[in-house]
Each structure stands twice: as C-alpha cells, then as structure tokens.
Regions:
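Hydrophobic beta-strand-centered segment that forms part of the acyl-chain substrate-binding groove
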Residues: 34-38, 46-79, 180, 184-219, ...
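Accessory, usually C-terminal, subdomains that scaffold auxiliary metal cofactors
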Residues: 205-260
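Short hinge/gating elements
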Residues: 32-36, 167-169
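Residue-level detector of beta-strand face positions
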Residues: 59, 80-84, 232-236
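A mid-sequence, solvent-exposed acidic-amphipathic segment
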Residues: 142-208
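Intrinsic-disorder/low-complexity, polar/charged segments enriched in Ser/Thr/Lys/Arg/Asp/Glu/Gln
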Residues: 23-27, 57, 154-158, 202, ...
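Non-catalytic linker/capping segments at the edges of enzyme domains
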Residues: 1-27, 78-171
Length: 260
C-alpha cells in the first residue's frame, strides 16, 4: 500500500508516521535552513527525516551529501527507509538491534557549561559556521545554537539546549528530527584533539521520551574510539533531573575538504 505517494511536503512538516506499515512513500525537501555544510543538509536532521518512519531506536547511514531545496523521495519497504532521487541514494534507515547499552558520562555542571561555552570556536575557527545545529553564524529562531565546547574537567564536549516553541509538532512536543539533529554535532566536538575535519557517516539513536519546548537540556558528546580516518563517538542528552532523554552513537569519517 502506498501512503501520500509523491506528495510535496515543506521541510518543516512531518510526513505521516505510520511506522508499522510497509510500502509507504512521500516526497520531502531539505530547506536551506537545515544545512550542515554550505550545500548539503545537516546529517543529524536528515537522519531524523529518515528515522521518523522507524518504530523505536534506529540506525541511519548517510550515503552521499544531501542536496538542498530539491524534491527527494522517502520510501519505506519492509523495515528499511530510503531517501533518494534519480541521481543517488542519500540515506538509509533501519531498526537498531544494538540497544546502545554503553556507559555514558553524567550531565555537566553549571560551572562546566559556563567554561565550555567560552572554549567553543568562534566564526573564524569554526569548520562549518553556517551549520543548523552548531553554526556560530546562526542565531535563535534560525539555528539550534548548540555550542558544545570542551569541558575543563573531562574529555567531553558539553552544551545547554533549550528547544524553542517553533520546533514542536502538532502534539506539542519537539519533533524527533530536531532531537536527531541535536545529537549530531556535539559528538564531533567531543572528538579528541587534534580534531580533524570530518563528516557524519552513520548515526544510531534511541529517544527515551518526548521533549517539550522550553525544557532545559544538557548535552554531552565524546569520542569512544578511533581507527584510522574513522572516529566512533556518542552523544547523550540529559534533562534537569539528570535523566537520559536521548542517546546516540555516531561514525565520523575524516575528509580533506568539504564537498563542493
């Protein structure tokens, strides 16, 4: 059965969440607002678009830079969701077998957050200053403004995030694609120095509960291991009570320069 077959949706509007069904398809676009590098979508945001049709924890592989402002097909066949067009397959999402049961650092303290904010690179030192999630050229109401700086006490990057009301869907909760986006960049800034230029190749996430706009969240990113050009990292989001809201693991791959 085909649901919403080739219906054009604005990038900020969710397609139908029918995770138990198969054979569904629609059309989405990644608006320029949701870019990572200058000419392609933010990896976490795009992963969230694909994962919306997966019930429960999901893993998303990013197969090619995701173009901006062009129609993309989103299709689910059995357990797999693909984002693609006539030129390429861009993302593949599937249910996650790994429960992500690894040890996570505790939430950052107020002092830690304050010190980390001071260490975050400014526009001249930022590798992708226009990024929707972490770009220093983006302001409130435009980007997520998650500036995960280095902790002075631990080998992690930490930041505070208070989601804005416009990130909410019809149910009043922050749309999960934005939680996926928030899980993206902090894991990069958690990579150990010297931190290479790298792009997200794969991300797996588990969302523990819905998030309400205005909640005060604390985000921690860290490197778990590295092998050659591959860096395995993770991100955890805690609420004010210290409970885990979302958790992810990510694969970053070093590159020499950003794609044109």
């Amino acid at each position: 059965m085909t649901v919403s077959s080739l219906v054009a949706l604005p990038s900020h509007v969710s397609g139908p969440r029918l995770a138990g069904m198969t054979g569904q398809s629609d059309e989405v676009q990644v608006h320029r607002r949701f870019r990572g590098p200058p000419t392609s979508g933010n990896g976490g945001y795009v992963a969230g678009l694909a994962a919306e049709w997966i019930e429960g924890p999901a893993q998303v592989s990013l197969l090619a830079p995701i173009p901006l402002e062009v129609p993309l097909h989103r299709r689910r066949d059995d357990a797999e969701v693909m984002l693609f067009d006539a030129q390429a397959n861009y993302a593949r999402a599937a249910p996650l077998d790994d429960p992500l049961n690894f040890e996570v650092p505790g939430p950052p303290t107020e002092d830690e957050l304050e010190a980390a904010a001071m260490s975050f690179p400014g526009p001249s030192g930022h590798p992708i200053p226009g990024c929707f999630v972490c770009g220093t050229e983006r302001g409130p109401g435009d980007g997520l403004c998650i500036f995960a700086g280095e902790s002075p006490h631990r080998d992690v990057a930490v930041a505070e995030w208070i989601p804005e009301a416009e990130l909410a869907g019809e149910d009043g909760h922050v749309e999960e694609r934005y939680l996926w986006a928030a899980l993206d960049c902090p894991s990069y800034f958690g990579l150990c120095e010297p931190r290479p230029l790298a792009l997200l190749a794969q991300i797996a996430a588990r969302i523990e509960r819905p998030v309400t706009p205005g909640e005060r969240l604390r985000i921690t990113g860290w490197e778990r291991s590295r092998e050659g050009r591959k860096h395995h990292a993770a991100t955890v989001i805690h609420d004010e009570a210290g409970e885990i809201v979302a958790l992810s693991k990510a694969l970053w791959v070093e590159i020499k320069e950003l794609p044109a």
